[in-house]
Amino acid sequence: MYRDFIIFALGILTSFMLIIIFGEIHDRYGNTPSNREKRKYIEDRIKEVHDALKIAFAEMKYTSRDSITDNYCEYAKLQLEWLNSEDVMCHGNVEDVMRLRRDCLDLFASNKNRSLRSVVLEDIDDITWETNRLSSTYDYKIKFYTKAYKIYISWLNSNDLLCESTSERELYKAKLEKAILHLQSIR
C-alpha cells in the first residue's frame, strides 16, 4: 500500500514536471514568428518607411528648419541600421531593401548638401570594407550582399549621375565584382 502511494506520488510529480518543462519550451520557442510572418512584417515596415521618407522629402523641400531635417536624418540613420539587421537580411526582399537604402541615402545627401553620387559611392566603400571581414558563418549576409552588389552594379550602369566618368564607373564596378568573387569564395 505504501509502495503504491509512492509510485502514485512520483507519477503525479513527473506529470507536473513534464507540464512545466513543455510549457517553458512552448513559451521560449512556440511564440517566435514564422518566416512568413517575418517577411510580412519586413514588407509592411519597408512600406511605412517609404511613406515616411516621402513626407520627409516634401517637408524638407518646403522648410529650412534644421531641427526638422535633423530629425528626419536621424530617422533615416535608424532605418539604415535596421536594414543591416539579421532579420532583414534573412527574410527581406533584397530589391525592396536596396530601394529603401537608396532613399535613405538620398535623404542624407539632400540634407548635407552633398551629391547622391558621393553618398552612394561612400556607402559602396563602407559595405565592401565590411564584407571583406566576413567569415563563412554569416551565410545570410553572404547571400544578401551578393545580391545587393549586383543591384549596385545595375545602379552604376543605369544612372549616369552616380559616376562622373566611365573610368570611375568601371573602377566601382570592378570593386563590386571583386567583392562578389570574394563572397563566393568564402562560401
Predicted feature locations:
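Short amphipathic alpha-helical heptad-repeat segments
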Residues: 41-52, 68-79, 93, 116-124, ...
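Transmembrane-cytosolic junction motif
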Residues: 21-40
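Repeat-associated, polar segments at repeat-unit boundaries in modular proteins
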Residues: 79-121, 159-187
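Charged, low-complexity interaction regions
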Residues: 57-70, 87-95, 133-143, 160-169
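Feature marks short, highly hydrophobic, charge-poor N-terminal signal-anchor/signal peptide-like helices
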Residues: 1-10
